[in-house]
Amino acid sequence: MNNNFWKGKRVLITGDTGFKGAWLSLILGMHGAKVQGISSSKFSGNNELYSLLSVNKISNTVDCDVRDFDGVLSAFNSFNPEVVFHLAAQPLVRQSYQDPVTTYEVNVMGTMSILEAVRQSPSVQSAVIVTTDKCYKNNEWEWGYRENDPMGGHDPYSSSKACAELLTQSYQQSFFNDCSNSTGVSTVRAGNVIGGGDFSEDRLIPDLYRAISTNNKLLLRSPLATRPWQHVFEPISGYLKVAEGLFESGAKANDCWNFGPNNSDIRTVQEITELFLACWGIKDIIDFDTSTQPHEAKSLSLDISKAQFKLYWSPQWDLENAMEKTAIWYKACFEDGDILKISTEQIEEYY
């Protein structure tokens, strides 16, 4: 991260009340950026971190559904952002089975609204569209997916994010294609993120935290499934590098990027569970859920060599260190500690 680059930059973040969005807002605010958010109060189920980090003191958050193009464009026109990060999404696989229509509307047409607002906003020089590692056609193999592998998606969430990738690619080729004059636009695909402040349903670490704090057992599903686990600061640092490059080079830098851990940190759900519980010194709070579940990929990993070679980006914290930082944060939350102080200290250590 080029700390000096962000001083005074006008940065618009969609989904700033969510997990990554709140962290990104605090990081940018600490580095002197002028931040505005777009988030909808209709989807306010996971905005605890936004409050705990006092993001409202950093960002003027506009209550707007990203599917509302007129509202989105109005927010762009009033703020005149120079850099845009699009994180707003319906982010859960299992919820996408329950409500596929909203999932596709938010993740595809919401992305369309942001891309079109970027196209119509002369102030924007750099836009980063956040999708997911699940956008790839999953072959359930041991190799990491590369950026040029086919898009796919078995479940509605994964499919909707693959659609967002194809939509962005179309905009890159149709509208952001003048290397001397066009806005720079790229997509970024990250693995499973951990870190303090995620309180979403149906995510492993938040579910473990709730089980610990309520003294209940957690039913663990798919314990042998592997995922590319990484601390939330890792992909955010990649997003920032991409945004800086787009700002400097415009459409010449248009691309797509994977951000994930080193291969040694691609672990099973059970291994991650045991590591988190070890950080707490707790045992015997999990059982195994043997009931039939909606389809979720059993094996998933990313090839990050492109970001390593072209962006000089690499993960800074191994999984053990990342999990220790995560546990420290949740312990502080459990004990009513000074969350903002711990959060800023962790940011300062990483960045």
Which residues are covered by each model-predicted region?
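NAD(P)-dependent short-chain dehydrogenase/reductase
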Residues: 139-144, 148, 156, 165-250, ...
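C-terminal "lid/loop" region of Rossmann-like NAD(P)-dependent oxidoreductases
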Residues: 254-257, 267-273, 281-299, 340-346
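Generic structural signal for small/hydrophobic residues in well-ordered secondary structure
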Residues: 6, 16-18, 84, 171, ...
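Generic structural signal for alpha-helix termini and adjacent loop/cap motifs
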Residues: 99, 117, 121, 174, ...
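C-terminal amphipathic/interface module of NAD(P)-dependent oxidoreductases
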Residues: 4-5, 303-351
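N-terminal Rossmann-like NAD(P)+-binding domain of SDR-like oxidoreductases, especially those catalyzing
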Residues: 1-190, 333, 349-351
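Conserved C-terminal active-site "lid" loop/helix of NAD(P)H-dependent oxidoreductases
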Residues: 232, 255-256, 292-314, 335
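Residues in well-ordered alpha-helical elements
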Residues: 69-70, 82, 94, 101, ...
